[in-house]
């Protein structure tokens, strides 16, 4: 699994002209799933995300997790995170998992992340054409890939 985490002042996702979900202060997370991703990847990633210390403490130092900061999370499925640009100029998405694999993993990721956060995680709609709006705070943007657990 590959995620791009952005610390946001607010974020929202619109589908067919209607706001599907919106959050205030917290994280907007793009998540891409590939064929070899597993339930173990979800567990590791959820723990990593909720414990990332990317929120400012009283001294302005990034020393608080989203749990301590009581922030919200918006998760957006994003198969293009697995784009390969090795050949030519048109990205290939062959590494992205097919829906029969990615949908159950995406749903489990969102459920497990809600449990780890202790409140509902807002989402877009898997496979939909979405308009995502956010105000990046910092900016703080973190990329994590479960195939490269550093």
From Swiss-Prot:
SUPFAM superfamilies: DTD-like. An aminoacyl-tRNA editing enzyme that deacylates mischarged D-aminoacyl-tRNAs. Also deacylates mischarged glycyl-tRNA(Ala), protecting cells against glycine mischarging by AlaRS. Acts via tRNA-based rather than protein-based catalysis; rejects L-amino acids rather than detecting D-amino acids in the active site. By recycling D-aminoacyl-tRNA to D-amino acids and free tRNA molecules, this enzyme counteracts the toxicity associated with the formation of D-aminoacyl-tRNA entities in vivo and helps enforce protein L-homochirality. A motif (Gly-cisPro motif, important for rejection of L-amino acids) lies at residues 138-139. This is D-aminoacyl-tRNA deacylase. Belongs to the DTD family. The gene is dtd. InterPro entries: Daa-tRNA_deacyls_DTD, DTD-like_sf. Its EC number is 3.1.1.96. One of its GO terms (molecular function) is Ser(Gly)-tRNA(Ala) hydrolase activity. HAMAP family: Deacylase_Dtd. Its main location: cytoplasm. It catalyses: glycyl-tRNA(Ala) + H2O = tRNA(Ala) + glycine + H(+); a D-aminoacyl-tRNA + H2O = a tRNA + a D-alpha-amino acid + H(+). GO terms for cellular component: cytoplasm.
